[in-house]
Structures are given as structure tokens and as C-alpha cells.
């Protein structure tokens, strides 16, 4: 409906036949028919006899403001309608789409409400009579009508449906009484399982059909909802088999389980994963023996080497090497000027051209990126895990002390919390971990460091519900070092990362949060290789129409 007068937002000016102008406040969901009715009600005209005209075109009154392609403060004019809209109400054919994908179709008058539309179908009438704590919701385009009161007060004409056909989505949402967050029926019971079995961020090929659907699609309603719940329960255990990256171990983020021997896993690996460059030909046995017999003979020859090979690399214990550093312990190489000159903040033509070239090259790189297969994506993940066997994490405390430690990519956020709690001065302190920007609280303790985007290095912030003077134990604070010394320690333990180049593209390492942000502000970004470099021109050839705020010619 038209927004009340006053306040911000868009507005439209309508010229009535009597020469008076009326200003109507509109929102993106306001229908143009409501603008005409509001103007006619104030000027005592019949809205069925007039249309709205913008410049030389007569507008479609069933369109919403967001789809009408009209500028803000547009000046419209009321003109006599080519054919009167008086008489019996127009019929609209409505297809009501349920959460299971089925549709119920029938014709309704444009003056009927959404509640009457829902009550017309027996399947939906049962859901409305026995909601079971859920709230009926109708979704049309981008408008969402929630609750019985809103459904009874919303007509098809108010949505702009005065003829033709339309599709309205119907779902039953249940709202959490604590957080007032909408959710689907039965979703709270499986929330922990969904969090524990969350797919990897880069494994988009393994996403199930339910993961790609919108959250409202999981809502249930009446008898059709029980059917969908049965489908979901039978579909849940049928998960795709997971092939371990390094021949053994457990799935990242999954429940721990017994390790697999390398011989069985290597035999079951697909060809695309066993050899990224292409499928390798099987070796011919000279003695004509079975390959399994040859593997047993090799295992008997060197059992110790076989045991070391079966031991997964990502499950080997890693030394945490806990170190505490503080930015104030860093010796400044040079004194920073007390105040930067004004010329530093002036925007030059070269700066604009350089930034524009970077944005164009980045957009071109994303648009022309080739499509990769699921096997290639899995090979990329495997290459990343092999390139960075350790994860360097730093936890920043409110008192600016930084706790540094090393982890495996397959370790969970819960392991990180245990590491932080073991070095607190007060182990009973209630705290939470988050990363920024944007602020994301790491509340899922079963999520791996790889899934939490803390790979291969990241800065994690610690927040406490009750502030304390000192957070870390005094023994660590006595041996605090400078951030540069901590960098040397990270470079020493992460030296394996700079190994031989791989045929796969190297992953982009996560930026390390160091107290050198001011240096990065003074150094211009390096140009991306292979992209068009901006042409540097002198400021004397600046066009006359280009006026900079503080340019000096």
C-alpha cells in the first residue's frame, strides 16, 4: 500500500484532471493502482475511469513501483481510460505452489483476499485449521504476507493482480520464540547434524539437492508436509561416498572414525584423483600374479614402511608452539611523521586510472574463468592441504596480547577453544571467538579450520562477556616477544609450504594480520601480471570537464 506522508523514501506527483497535484509516498512494493486510488480518493474521482500516464506512455497499473522503471519524484498525469474497468470484478487464474513443488490452480476474483484463496483448497484448509505452531505465509514476487491478519487484509487487487495468471508460493513457517527467527518444521532437530556434516566451501559439486533450495522450501504444511518430511528422512542417510584426500583419515568436519589402510583406498580412488595429469596405465605383473598378492608380499617385506604409509599425515600430532607477542614490543625502524601532508590524501588522475584498470582486470578474470570439474576441484583441495600441512593461528585478546599456535587443517574450532582455554589465567572465563570483517562468531565447535576459512593462516579475535584485566597466564606474559620474532617462528615452521611448484594453481593464502597496516597504506598495490596496465599521463593534459576537488595544475 502507499506509504504515509512524511519520512524518507520515494515519492510520485500525480496531476489530477482538475489541475491539482497530489504527492504520494511509495515503497518498492507499492502497486501503481494504489497510487491512482489514493489520488482519486482525495480528489473525489472514480479510479475505474482513469489511467496513469508518464510522458507519452500509459502505465500498467498492475506493476509494482520497483518494476515500473520510473524515477523518483516522477510526474504522472491522470488521463481518461481507453476502456472502463467498472462492472464485475476481473477474474485472475492463480497457481498456488506448495513446498513440495505441487501446484493447486483455480480462478478467483481480484477482490478476494489471500485468506479466502487459501481456504478454497481443502488441502490448505486443513493446515490453516491445525497450524501446529506454524504461521501461514504467502510469497508473491518479492512481497511476503505473514500471518492470518495480514492474509485477511490483503486482496489480489492490492498485489496488482487484476487479470491474467500468477503464481503464489505458500509455506508454513515456525518462528523460534527466543530469537524470533523463522525456520522450517523439523529443522531444529536436525540443526546439529547439518552443522556437523556441512560440506566444504569449495566442494560445490557435492552439494545435495536440498542445500541448493531456499530456506522456505524446507517448511512444512499439513498432509503434504509429512510426505516431504518422510522424503527428507529417507534422503538424509544416502550421502555421497567420501574419498579421503591423503589415503586415510576422516572427512573434514565429519565424525571421527577408524582410519583406512592406504592399499584399499588407493585402489578405490578414481583415475582423475590418483593422477591429476591424466589416468595412469596399470603396471603389468611379470610373474602373472594377482595384484593383491603382490601387495601382500610387499607388505610382508617392509611392514614398518607400510605402517608409516598408512598413518594419515593430517592426523599426526603437531606441536602447538604457544607464543605470546605484543605490538608495543616491536622496535620501530623509523619514526613516523606526526601528521601526513595534505597531498597524500589528494586523488589524482593516475590513482583513478590505476584503480579502474584493477577493477576491469578483476572482472575480466572472473567472467572468463573456465568451468572446472568436480575432480579438478577435489584435486585443488588436495593440493592445498599438501602444500600447507599446518595452520598458523593468532588469537588477539582485548588487551592487545596475541597468542600464536599451530594446528592441522582437519582440527576443529573446538580444538582451538581448548588451546585458548588452556593458556588463560582464569580457565573458567566465558569467552567466544570471532573473525572480522565481517564479524562472524565461530559458534560451531565441530567445524574444521579448513571449513571455517582459517586456512592456512588467520587472525582470530577473542571476546569476553565479562572484561578482565589480564587474560593470559602470567608465565606466558613474562616471555612475550615482538611480532617480528613471531613471524620468524611462523616462517620456520611453515617452510614446507614453499616446496616444488604444482601443476595446479596455487591457492591464495589468507592474509596474516600483522601490525603493519600503516606500511601497506603507503605502498601502492602491485599490478596483476597479464593485465592491461594503466597509461600514465601528465596532469597537464587533464580534460577541462574533469574537475578534481583539490587538484593543482
UniProtKB/Swiss-Prot annotation:
Skewed-composition ranges (Low complexity) = 182-202, 260-280
Q: Could you state one GO biological process linked to this protein?
A: regulation of D-glucose import
Q: How does it sit in the membrane?
A: Peripheral membrane protein
Q: Name one Pfam family in it.
A: TUG-UBL1
Subcellular location per UniProt equals: Endomembrane system; Endoplasmic reticulum-Golgi intermediate compartment membrane; Cytoplasm; Nucleus
Q: Which residues carry this modification: N-acetylalanine?
A: 2
Q: Which GO terms describe its cellular component?
A: cytoplasm; cytoplasmic side of plasma membrane; cytosol; endomembrane system; endoplasmic reticulum-Golgi intermediate compartment membrane; intracellular membrane-bounded organelle; nucleoplasm; nucleus
Q: Where is this region: Interaction with GLUT4?
A: 317-380
Please list the residue ranges annotated as the UBX domain.
386-462
Q: The organism sits in which domain of life?
A: Eukaryota
Q: Region Disordered: list its residue ranges.
A: 182-324, 499-536
- Tissue expression, per UniProt? Ubiquitous. Highly expressed in testis, heart, skeletal muscle and pancreas.
Site annotation (Breakpoint for translocation to form ASPSCR1-TFE3) points to: 311-312
Q: Where are the transmembrane segments?
A: none
Q: Name where it mostly resides.
A: membrane
Q: Where is the signal peptide?
A: none
Composition-biased stretches (Pro residues): 502-512
Q: Which InterPro entries match?
A: TUG-UBL1 (IPR021569), Ubiquitin-like_domsf (IPR029071), UBX_dom (IPR001012)
- Chain intervals with Basic and acidic residues compositional bias: 206-217, 296-324
Role: Tethering protein that sequesters GLUT4-containing vesicles in the cytoplasm in the absence of insulin. Modulates the amount of GLUT4 that is available at the cell surface. Enhances VCP methylation catalyzed by VCPKMT.
How this chain assembles, per its entry, is: Interacts with GLUT4. Interacts with VCPKMT. Interacts with VCP.
Q: What PANTHER family does the record tag this protein with?
A: TETHER CONTAINING UBX DOMAIN FOR GLUT4
- The protein depicted here goes by the name Tether containing UBX domain for GLUT4
Query: Which organism is this entry from?
Result: Homo sapiens (Human)
